[in-house]
Amino acid sequence: MEFVTETLGKRIHDPYVEETRCLMIPGPIIVGSGPSGLATAACLKSRDIPSLILERSTCIASLWQHKTYDRLRLHLPKDFCELPLMPFPSSYPTYPTKQQFVQYLESYAEHFDLKPVFNQTVEEAKFDRRCGLWRVRTTGGKKDETMEYVSRWLVVATGENAEEVMPEIDGIPDFGGPILHTSSYKSGEIFSEKKILVVGCGNSGMEVCLDLCNFNALPSLVVRDSVHVLPQEMLGISTFGISTSLLKWFPVHVVDRFLLRMSRLVLGDTDRLGLVRPKLGPLERKIKCGKTPVLDVGTLAKIRSGHIKVYPELKRVMHYSAEFVDGRVDNFDAIILATGYKSNVPMWLKGVNMFSEKDGFPHKPFPNGWKGESGLYAVGFTKLGLLGAAIDAKKIAEDIEVQRHFLPLARPQHC
């Protein structure tokens, strides 16, 4: 490490470094303190490997704490959502609430003594081939200062949901009512007796419509593409659990056939409700296209009863109305965009080919997308939710432990 220290020391005369505080980190740098980042740090900690977690927000799991609606629960049973090395409390229900999940994450961080550095926005991260180290430049802190953190390893844990997707819709600037993304939606209370257009029919869009109904609003759902809707449970067992068990014994297309037949028995023909099923089965579509099936928590019953209207693709928006591709026009008081999130990795990770510039996901799909070159790792990009993040977090910690036997960890130092 003497060569590394010497190389870094020479950079003190560079104009860029003169304005930047620089700190050498002995263990990995983890960008993001959501469940993926916390899981990776905990797995490293269990192997006596320190890490530094950088977080742009003011708290852990900021998406869960600040950008989710009040009625949210985990859509999968808690057994499939726990992070490594620490189960959920036995007192928690099968499907924990948002508040319970946040409390679990806070307890997890406390248990493993994980202390992220908050208010640190990563502006750029790149590999310095001269010294074989990662340089991560951030801005933030109390004085909004620029910092550079240096390490042999970089773990990208910003995940699939770093930035809101804001669709381009003709006429949106002309709409007279409020327009908000689901990241700003908390409950339907303020929309009581109002006609609301919800754009997007994923799990969030479907559940927001249900929440609006519960507050006596009048929601309409825009369904642009085909979608698989499955019951949350079949025969008293979670649909996800059944799928996982069956996949151990049967190929995907056989399990898909079973899921579709059971869904028709439980939910009926969703095509008649305007929710046309894709040609690919739900699991095959998830694997090939990354499209997650919707787990129904009561929305279909509201659609059948007429409390939720279903419209096809949105053509354009006018002052207080919207026109759809089938020619229908209806009036609305507000628009809620349930259009999801996207990765922001290409915005700040430079000079690597591990991630796609198009969607910000690793080029290699699960289970091979967790490891790149030169000490670069990714966690939380499996499209398998918390379960996938836990799997990759364990692999990353194991891999770094092997490497540290060949080159001991450095001591923290200014560079």
UniProtKB/Swiss-Prot annotation:
List, separated by semicolons, the cofactors it needs. FAD
Pathway assignment: Plant hormone metabolism; auxin biosynthesis
Q: Does the keyword Transmembrane apply?
A: no
**Annotated catalysed reactions:** indole-3-pyruvate + NADPH + O2 + H(+) = (indol-3-yl)acetate + CO2 + NADP(+) + H2O
Protein origin, superkingdom: Eukaryota
A GO molecular function assigned to this protein is: indole-3-pyruvate monooxygenase activity
Tissue specificity statement from the Swiss-Prot or TrEMBL entry: Expressed in anthers and in the apical gynoecium.
Q: Under which EC number(s) is this enzyme classified?
A: 1.14.13.168
Which SUPFAM superfamilies is this protein grouped with? FAD/NAD(P)-binding domain
The Gene Ontology biological process annotation of the record reads:
auxin biosynthetic process; response to ethylene
Task: Cite a single Pfam family from the UniProt record.
Answer: FMO-like
Q: Where does FAD bind?
A: 32-37
- Please state what is observed when this gene is inactivated: No visible phenotype, due to the redundancy with the other members of the YUCCA family.
Explain what induces or represses this protein's expression. Up-regulated by glucose. Down-regulated by heat stress. Positively regulated by LEC2 and by NGA3. Negatively regulated by SPL.
Q: Which residues bind NADP(+)?
A: 200-205
Q: What are the UniProt keywords, alphabetically?
A: Auxin biosynthesis, FAD, Flavoprotein, Monooxygenase, NADP, Oxidoreductase
Question: Could you confirm whether the keyword Flavoprotein appears in this record?
Answer: yes
Q: Which family does it belong to?
A: Belongs to the FMO family.
Q: Which PANTHER family match?
A: FLAVIN-BINDING MONOOXYGENASE-LIKE PROTEIN (AFU_ORTHOLOGUE AFUA_4G09220), INDOLE-3-PYRUVATE MONOOXYGENASE YUCCA2
Task performed by this protein: Involved in auxin biosynthesis. Converts the indole-3-pyruvic acid (IPA) produced by the TAA family to indole-3-acetic acid (IAA). Unable to use tryptamine (TAM) as substrate. Required for the formation of floral organs and vascular tissues. Belongs to the set of redundant YUCCA genes probably responsible for auxin biosynthesis in shoots.
State the name under which the record lists this protein: Indole-3-pyruvate monooxygenase YUCCA2
